[in-house]
Amino acid sequence: MRGVSKPQLAALFATLTAWWERFRRVPMVQHWGRELAAVGAILVVLAAPFLLKPAEGSAPREYNRRLVIYTPHHEKIRYEFGRAFAKKWKDERGETLYVDWRVAGTSEIALMMRSDYAAAFERYWTESLNHPWLPEVATSFGNSKVALPKPGEKAGLTVQQSARKEFLDSAVGIGVDLFFGGGAVDYESQARAGFLVAADASGQFGLKPVMKKHPEWFQPQSIPQSLGGESYYDKEARWVGTCLSSLGICFNRDVLARLGIEKEPVQWQDLGDPRYFGQVALADPNKSGTVTKAFEQLIQQQMQQAIDERRDDPNAEGDPEKLGIEIGWERGVHLIQRISANSRYFTDNATKIPLEVSQGDAAAGMCIDFYGWTFEDMVRRPDGTSRMGYITPLGGTSMGVDPIGMLRGAPEPEVAAAFMEFVLSDAGQKLWNFSPGTAGGPVRTPLRRLPVRLDFYNAANRASMTDPHADPMETSRAFTYHPEWTNHLFGVVRYLVKVMCVDTHEDQRRAWEMLISRNFPPRATAVFEDTRLLNYQNAQELAALLQKKDKIQEARKATELSVAFRNQYRRAYQLAKDGF
């Protein structure tokens, strides 16, 4: 049990044994021994959680203020930032602050926020405004597509418009102050819904006042509004990036040597090499936004390469960008198919990928940079070498941000604003990448995250960093994310991997293994790689289908496509087996 030492457990067991020896000598106990023993066992089970509870909880016994934060961040980040900010608040304000972390994945947090805001606004709508709660209100208050009249227009409001306007004008809250960690896409969605705000009702506290107080932080040389096609902060000041991250490949050098692969992977297409069969660790994109983002960026890299090829070809006809996007999409889908065919299985959590690679259960996999670096450190040998490695595919990934934003109706807007200011300050930025034990660094373990402020990367700071050679600018220059190419197809990427790879994985792997053993006979290979059902045009139609949010139609289409690919893989297997 956490918080209870072995001597304490031994003493507890000895005491209970002595009590039992005395108790069982009582005449009534000797007569009803079995029944009383059963009752006693039940009581012990019920009392154990209280007897063996940790000596200390995460909350202080007494506190003056409480800051509630939704976050997907792991315990190391929560500990370092919670500890450092609470100390700063105590030193400056003389108050004990309790940082109350509410931990879940970003998709779960999104569901909780929508559900909680719906319940909170329903109370406000029915009790404060005395309006009936209607289905139109429930679906409109947080819907950014509900258009409101422009200032000066006198047109009457519909029920949907009234609900939307009242919500945006309100200070309805859910008892949570901040959303900290995740991806910019998640924050853009919450900001559009109206759940994230630039300032509280008074206008005194929030990110907007912080930006006004520190304009030097929000300059191109520090935190640019966008870089490499990725937004670094919201133009309406509802969220801002706090640290940087990119996607890449983690790999195990020992496993590569066992497989006879001398060259370490450096690009996404390396994971499609047949020599990696059964040795790639992947997560299900339908349960991992990280892997979906990696696949999207893989596709964009193929698009950019196809566009460049057509622009450099003097005989190429048509619009290079339009045709390049379509060709690149097809190439990207083929590469995803090969990487999937090489995978052992699809795990349900992206964090398991570097764990499996570090343990030697897989040769390589896709992961976020800081997970790759962390596991590389965990298995580092005394001589400084490590069987684990991580590489960012240059030109194949962007440098995105992990943001923070204040929620509408935050109970402690002053503390929330101070926390955001702290995270962006020199003190907060040092926590992300300074080595433990250095001045301003974390006290327990390195966080291995890259600070968002580009002005942070100077010689003085690099001397204390765990990743002194990191260069966010180089990564950003090598890859430009074009949201207009694939942003609207993000859900389609998840969908196509499900029907083409996850649901059909057994048949896909079986066919791929046979193709490898027969040295890829042309006819069988062509059948295996036939992805016309998921070409760029059909992807647009799938996007329209997913936009309707009709689960029955989605399931029906998924079944249709899964059956088609399963039959296709079985046919490819048989053709390859027969040498065709």
Residue ranges and their predicted role:
Residues 34-35, 49-189, 354:
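Early extracytoplasmic/lumenal segment of secretory-pathway proteins
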Residues 68, 269-290, 298-302, 320-324:
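Short loop->beta-strand "edge-of-pocket" segments that line small-molecule binding or catalytic clefts
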Residues 151-180, 192-250, 269, 391-395:
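A structural signal for short loop-to-beta-strand junctions that line the ligand-binding cleft
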Residues 212, 222, 245, 282-283, 314-315, 422-449, ...:
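Periplasmic-binding protein-like
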Residues 250-255, 399-414, 431-432:
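A bilobed periplasmic-binding-protein/Venus flytrap-type ligand-binding module shared by bacterial periplasmic
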Residues 293-384, 430-431:
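Ligand-binding pocket segment of bilobal, Venus flytrap-like solute-binding proteins
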Residues 472-580:
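Conserved C-terminal helix/tail region of periplasmic/extracytoplasmic solute-binding proteins
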